[in-house]
């Protein structure tokens, strides 16, 4: 485990023991006990992984001693040699599991996420593709037991979306979807193409960790809230009351418009949720760039202008350009469950990059 110091592991184990003693006292206020329990749940897996590595190493030392004891029983020596080989095979995986648990965690990983998809170059075909992507993420979410709530949608004339925003709620949503941010490109024959020519279109995906009220404080004086009547395709009014809401955050200039609900109150609540999430992401980006002279990750830059993936319909393939992975299972991926293989490969690549940095 090059680069992993025993001092850090000892510090974690000492903190684990301290937390156990504190929680056993029985006289703590409930809020303090809850916080200590969270701290314990975070470091206990690290301590367990360290204990497993230590146990395997100690067992290997004993077995090596038995195998090298020429005065010992020949049958016992043979058994010791065999068991030592088994432990040598298990030890690297145990060490890697410990190393992964020691990596710095993204505090947002366990959060729910805001998913935003916008049609890019390609007109009607790009909007249809944006709809395909949204359905892919919906099905993927359903497969994992997450809840998807539509926040806003701007439908296109031939189907699909010019823009769609949804909240995806569940444990660890952001951790699995954060590498989806970027430009997704599609190559296929559009429904409007009579000559059978393949066109290239694109849609942009942004995945943001959802913010809670405690994360972002918004002063009322920093907001300008305008209300007006909702409008449908072509600009015609679809509501007789002023239910649509436009919120402008004056310090940053961020503008959020929400008109999908018939209730002004519901539209305002949804708009504030989107605004809070975008402000939280701005702060995350600021802190990351401050820390960052740091890691230029091939996988996790999160740059929304970066072309990350191509969906080629004639060849039935999906290629993720960040890790040079091509899967000839386009239909299965667009159906949702097949997306997990891409997501898993991206997470594994990110872990490998961070482990290499830890060892370096």
From Swiss-Prot:
It holds the Pfam family RF-1. Gene3D superfamilies: 3.30.160.20, 3.30.70.1660, 6.10.140.1950. It is found in: Cytoplasm. PROSITE patterns: RF_PROK_I (PS00745). The keyword tRNA processing does not apply. GO terms for molecular function: translation release factor activity, codon specific. Methylated by PrmC. Methylation increases the termination efficiency of RF1. GO terms for cellular component: cytoplasm. SUPFAM superfamilies: Release factor. It comes from the Bacteria. The modification N5-methylglutamine is found at residue 236. InterPro entries: PCRF (IPR005139), Pep_chain_release_fac_I (IPR000352), Pep_chain_release_fac_I_sf (IPR045853), Prokaryotic/Mito_RF (IPR050057), RF-1 (IPR004373). Its main location: cytoplasm. Keywords: Cytoplasm, Methylation, Protein biosynthesis. SMART domains: PCRF. Belongs to the prokaryotic/mitochondrial release factor family. HAMAP family: Rel_fac_1. Peptide chain release factor 1 directs the termination of translation in response to the peptide chain termination codons UAG and UAA. This is Peptide chain release factor 1. The lineage of its organism: Bacteria, Pseudomonadati, Pseudomonadota, Alphaproteobacteria, Sphingomonadales.
């Amino acid at each position: 485990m090059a680069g992993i110091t025993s001092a850090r592991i000892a510090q974690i184990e000492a903190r684990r023991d301290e937390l156990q003693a504190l929680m056993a006292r029985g006289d703590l206020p409930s809020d303090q006990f809850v916080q200590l329990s969270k701290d314990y749940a975070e470091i206990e897996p690290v301590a367990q992984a360290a204990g497993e590595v230590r146990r395997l190493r100690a067992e290997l030392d004993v077995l090596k001693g038995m195998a090298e004891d020429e005065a010992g029983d020949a049958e016992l020596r043979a058994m010791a040699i065999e068991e030592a080989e088994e432990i040598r095979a298990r030890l690297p995986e145990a060490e890697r599991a410990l190393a992964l648990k020691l990596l710095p965690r993204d505090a947002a990983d366990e959060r729910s996420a805001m998913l935003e998809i916008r049609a890019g170059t390609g007109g009607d075909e790009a909007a249809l593709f944006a709809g395909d992507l949204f359905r892919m993420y919906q099905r993927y979410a359903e497969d994992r037991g997450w809840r998807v709530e539509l926040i806003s949608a701007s439908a296109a004339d031939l189907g699909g979306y010019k823009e769609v925003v949804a909240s995806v709620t569940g444990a660890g949503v952001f951790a699995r979807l954060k590498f989806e941010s970027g430009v997704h490109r599609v190559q296929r024959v559009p429904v409007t193409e009579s000559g059978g020519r393949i066109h290239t279109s694109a849609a942009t995906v942004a995945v943001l960790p959802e913010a809670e009220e405690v994360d972002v404080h918004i002063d009322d004086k920093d907001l300008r809230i305008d209300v007006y009547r909702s409008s449908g395709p072509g600009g015609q009014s679809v509501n007789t009351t002023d239910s649509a809401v436009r919120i402008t955050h004056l310090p940053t200039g961020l503008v959020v418009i929400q008109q999908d609900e018939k209730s002004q109150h519901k539209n305002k609540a949804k708009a504030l949720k989107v605004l809070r999430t975008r402000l939280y992401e701005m702060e995350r980006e600021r802190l990351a760039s401050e820390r960052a002279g740091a890691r230029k990750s091939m996988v996790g830059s999160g740059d929304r202008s970066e072309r990350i993936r191509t969906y080629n319909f004639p060849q039935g393939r999906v290629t993720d350009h960040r890790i040079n992975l091509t899967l000839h299972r386009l239909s299965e991926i667009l159906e949702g469950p097949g997306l997990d293989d891409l997501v898993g490969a991206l997470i594994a690549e990110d872990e490998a990059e961070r482990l290499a940095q830890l060892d370096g």
